[in-house]
Amino acid sequence: MGDSPYEIMNELRKRESGLDMAYVVRSANQQVPAGVRKVVYGSADWVSMLARSKYLVSNNNLPEFFAKRDGQVYLQTWHGTPLKRLGSDITTGAASSFYVSAMAREAAGWDYLVSPSPFCSEVLPRALGFSGKVLESGYPRNDRLVTESETRGRVRASLGVSDSEVLVLYAPTWRDSKRTMSGAWAGVNFFDASLPAGFRLMFRGHNNTKSAHKSALAGGAIDVTNYPDVTDLFLAADVLVTDYSSVMFDFSVTGKPMAFLVPDLAEYEANRGFYFDFRAEAPGPLFSSASELVAALGNLGDYSAKYSAWQKKFNPHEDGKSAVRVVNLVWGA
């Protein structure tokens, strides 16, 4: 459990708002906070709650059959700052007309869209076809990156990682061009080099490749693909290694080092398109092989100026109070 809807729910709980709150889970075995109703995704109760709820809070699209009724308020938090182009901004042929029109239909039902930055406030409404109210509040899911300190030790202990070890989180995104014969997304893993003594590796497969991540898992890595809250992993890690994933924007709230393993950079950019010059603005070094990256892990270079510029551009509101601002704006202070 996690992400912005969860943090918004927790803020409402703190305020004893009196709202009857339900939280959607994928499995009946998942736990929800006291006083919150558990609703299993795909169940009859879930369909009923979609129809009856006054407020809907989601970080992704609702099912195609859903039609917002009069009086419902739909708060869309979205699920990350984009490097790669989205929706109608994709000009490379990677997006079908069906996808673009379906996205626009979905966005037409949103009343509010949460944004972490002026960059997203400009890009997301245009790309997704949204014309409602943008709440440039910061991402509620990132509040804990600012406010929590005890989580780091707890998570590392649960993973069997000592305080003295350097914990590297490898979190690659999925590829439009990589699918199996069945149509599922293929796993992605370019981290094929061993870490030196004193370093440990966590592997976090993308949600789209969960069914394939086992075969992609780097040897000796700690598999955290199904760990429930990636924010815990950001707090536990000392270094992030990613490629084009939006985790780069969230992790940068911590101020900890990042490196980018991008052997297919030219191909990926040509296929999807980027919103900015990634090579010029990246807040850490870019590597074309894992062996090069591992050799440089002890000294990733001075990226302080680029890192600071990155945070100002993409994380200007991340002060630990984003959920407070969203709740104030939607439900009233």
What are these regions (language model features)?
Residues 81-180, 207, 306-309:
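A nucleotide-sugar donor-handling region in carbohydrate enzymes
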